[in-house]
Amino acid sequence: MRSREPWRLPAGQSRAVPFLQAAVLFAALCIFARSAALVLAAFLAAPVPAAQTLLHLGQQAVESRAAESSAESAAEAASAPSPAQEAAAPVQTGVEQYFVALQPDEARPADAGTVTEQQFGQGSGEKYIPCGAGSIKNNTRQTAADIAAEAAQPLPFAIEKDSAAPQVLIMHTHATEDYRRSAGLWFTPGDGARSTDRSINMCAVGRVMTDTLNAAGICTLHDETLNDYPSYTGSYANSRAVVQQYLAQYPSIKVVLDVHRDAIERENGTRCAPVCTIDGRQAAQVMIICGCDNGTSVQLPAWRQNLRFAAAWERSMEAKYPGLTRPVLFSYRFYNQDLTTGSLLIEIGGHGNNLNEALYAGYLAAQGLVETLLG
């Protein structure tokens, strides 16, 4: 009977190669298992109204992991020498990594709606109170002197930098609000400027802001619950319940930002995009809305503290990025701003802006907020 020769590796191949391959595979499986466990734990611990958001984020994590794996495989394949290798595309950095492809003018329908651009100034007259390089538009019975004095006060809270405890919550009462899809100044007829797709609606802007704050050491949570879907009616009651449960679970939260977009439309149906240019790139303008207690229908006992925060953020943004802000709107609006002493609503552009302008504006607003909160 012929004796069997011992198994040998092919010439030039080390036994370490299959061992390393097995080790890499084992490590990848461990990382995936850990990610799945974290998503499950977060789902079980999170506020009930946010469960839908966590499921969505869990799916995003899986897709992201698959994309990373695919990218690694592609990188390995690309590393092999080729006779005519094309130049690699430039690596995107900063806010550009969030940008999306916009519709070209070739896709413009014959009956497309028109968009016009306008840069809004800080305003003048007795209604406008200077706030650093920015301003506050007073639509209340409070005197200009009272508002100016309050705006000069320090923040009513202190943010803990690099803390594991959440400091900021970003959410969206009208999460389905979205932006222009076209690169040119036109929009598709019948486009209601709303979408349940979180990659293009307000959740996309909130994600940029959240990432920017977290990168600066401000622990920030982002809730992506579609509070205005399937019904727009009751959206503020829905978002109030979400915020209350976050505050109960994370009492360390000092700031709650309700991130929206505006809708400026002319009588003839033309949509207006509030714009500015920052560092050579066009951005949507932003506007903070701060509510005031009117003693009857609008009960906001902490309106003074919220106003201090609004004024400080306005000053930081307009000083750092001249032209980015429209005047703070100080008015008898409720918007659930009774829940903390750092509750504000901010409009990031309007339905006339394209998504990339809004994403850039969200990034700039968050950078201004970092300076406001950390000094």
Regions found by a protein language model. Name each.
Residues 302-329:
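Active-site-adjacent substrate-binding region
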Residues 240-243, 268-276, 328-334:
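Alpha-helical scaffolding within the catalytic cores
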Residues 1-16:
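N-terminal Lys/Arg-rich, disordered targeting/topogenic segments
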Residues 169-172, 220-222, 255-258, 287-290, ...:
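Structural recognition of the beta-strand scaffold that forms the well-ordered cores
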Residues 175-178, 226-230, 261-266, 293-296, ...:
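Solvent-exposed loop/turn segments at secondary-structure junctions
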Residues 323-375:
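Active-site-adjacent mobile loop/cap segments within catalytic or ligand-binding domains
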Residues 20-254, 263-268, 363, 371-375:
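N-terminal catalytic or cofactor-binding beta/alpha core of small enzyme domains
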Residues 188-192, 264-299:
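A short, glycine/acidic-enriched catalytic loop
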